[in-house]
C-alpha cells in the first residue's frame, strides 16, 4: 500500500537540525515537507534554502507573529485548514501557491512534530512510514499519541560530528507524570502524551503537540526521539532565549535559574541508555527526568 504523507516542520534557531529533519521525513519516510521558519537568528534560514528543491513551500514568519497566545501555532493550523484569517503581510512564501495546497484533500496523514522530534512507530521492526501504511485502513484510528524518549549530550559525544542524530546516542524514556498515556503516573518522568500525527481530514490544533483536551487515553502509542538539548552551549543559549521569550513554555525560566547555580544538566553516559539505531528503545526509567525538567 502507498499512502500520501505530509510532514510540517517548524524551526526557530535550529540550524543543526534542518538536514536531519529533511533527510528523515522525506527520504527515509516518504513524506512531502512544508517548512515554517519563525524569526531565526542563526543559519536556519540559509540551511532551509539549501533544501528548497525538497520542500513544497517555505513559510518565513516574522517576529510580529509571536508565540504569545499561541499565535505561531494558530497561523500554521490556519494555513493547513486554508483559513485566510492570517497575517499574510508578515509571511513570505517560496511557493506562490502556498496558501492553496489543499493539504486535507491531497494527503492521507499529516505529522507536525517539533523541530527536534523524530517520530517512530511502536517499535523498530518497520519504518515510521510503513507503520502508517499498516494502520491506514483502520478507520477508527484518527490520531497517534507519542511517548517521549529524551536524548541528551554526554561526554561520549564526538563534537566533530555535525549531525545531532549521529552524534547523540544516549537517551532515557520520559514517561508522563500524568495519565495522558497510562493509568499510572510516572514518578521519574514528567512529560505528557503528545499528538503529532493525524488523518489529514481529522487534524487537531495543538501547542507543541499538546491538545486542549488530553483526557482520553488511546491504545495506539508510538515513540518519538526528542533531541531537545544537544550540547552545553546549546543548553545555555536555549534556556536564555526561551526564558526571555513569552512562548508559553514557562519551565524554561525555572531551568534557566537552576542553570546559574547547578551543574546537574551535565549527564554522564552511564546514567542513560545507548541507542544503536537498530534495537528497540528501552522502556525502563533509568534516569529521573524530574531532576532536569521542573514540569512539562
Question: How would you label these PLM feature ranges?
Answer:
Residues 23-31:
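Short, acidic, metal-binding catalytic loop of nucleotide-sugar glycosyltransferases
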Residues 31, 108, 142:
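Short acidic/polar active-site loop segments enriched in Thr and Asp
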Residues 38, 113-115, 122:
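Active-site acidic Asp-centered loop
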Residues 24, 36-44:
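Ser/Thr-glycine-rich phosphate-binding loops at phosphate-binding pockets of nucleotides
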Residues 1-23:
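N-proximal low-complexity "stem/linker" segments adjacent to membrane-targeting elements
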Residues 31-39, 59-63:
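Short beta-strand/loop segment that forms part of the nucleotide-sugar
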Residues 69-74, 84, 90-97, 121-296:
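Catalytic-site signature of metal-activated, phosphate-bearing donor transferases
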Residues 45-112, 120-121:
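Active-site-proximal specificity loops/subdomain of glycosyltransferases
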Amino acid at each position: 500500500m502507498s499512502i500520501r504523507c505530509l510532514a510540517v516542520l517548524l524551526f526557530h534557531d535550529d540550524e543543526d537540525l534542518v538536514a536531519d529533519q529533511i533527510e528523515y521525513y522525506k527520504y527515509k519516510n516518504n513524506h512531502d515537507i512544508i517548512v515554517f521558519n519563525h524569526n531565526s537568528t542563526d543559519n536556519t534560514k540559509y540551511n532551509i534554502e539549501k533544501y528548497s528543491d525538497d520542500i513544497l513551500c517555505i513559510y518565513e514568519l516574522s517576529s510580529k507573529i509571536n508565540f504569545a497566545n499561541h499565535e505561531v501555532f494558530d497561523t500554521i493550523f490556519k494555513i493547513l485548514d486554508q483559513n485566510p484569517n492570517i497575517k499574510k503581510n508578515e509571511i513570505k512564501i517560496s511557493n506562490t501557491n502556498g496558501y492553496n495546497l489543499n493539504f486535507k484533500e491531497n494527503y492521507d496523514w499529516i505529522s507536525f512534530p517539533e523541530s527536534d522530534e523524530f517520530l517512530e512507530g511502536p517499535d523498530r521492526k518497520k519504518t515510521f512510514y510503513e507503520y502508517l501504511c499498516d494502520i491506514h485502513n483502520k478507520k477508527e484510528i484518527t490520531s497517534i499519541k507519542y511517548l517521549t524518549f529524551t536524548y541528551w549530550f554526554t561526554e561520549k559525544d564526538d563534537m566533530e560530528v555535525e549531525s545531532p542524530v549521529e552524534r547523540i546516542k544516549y537517551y532515557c524514556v520520559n514517561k508522563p507524570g500524568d495519565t495522558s498515556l497510562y493509568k499510572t503516573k510516572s514518578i521519574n518522568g514528567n512529560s505528557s502524551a503528545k499528538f503529532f500525527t493525524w488523518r489529514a481530514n481529522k487534524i487537531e490544533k495543538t501547542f507543541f503537540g499538546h491538545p486542549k483536551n488530553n483526557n482520553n487515553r488511546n491504545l495506539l502509542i508510538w515513540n518519538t526521539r526528542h533531541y531537545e538539548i544537544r550540547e552545553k552551549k546549546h543548553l545555555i543559549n536555549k534556556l536564555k532565549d526561551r526564558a526571555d521569550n513569552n512562548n508559553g513554555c514557562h519551565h524554561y525560566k525555572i531551568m534557566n535559574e537552576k542553570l546559574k547555580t547547578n551543574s546537574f544538566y551535565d549527564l554522564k553516559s552511564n546514567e542513560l541508555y545507548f541507542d544503536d539505531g537498530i534495537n528497540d528503545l528501552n522502556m525502563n526509567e533509568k534516569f529521573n527526568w524530574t531532576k532536569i525538567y521542573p514540569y512539562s
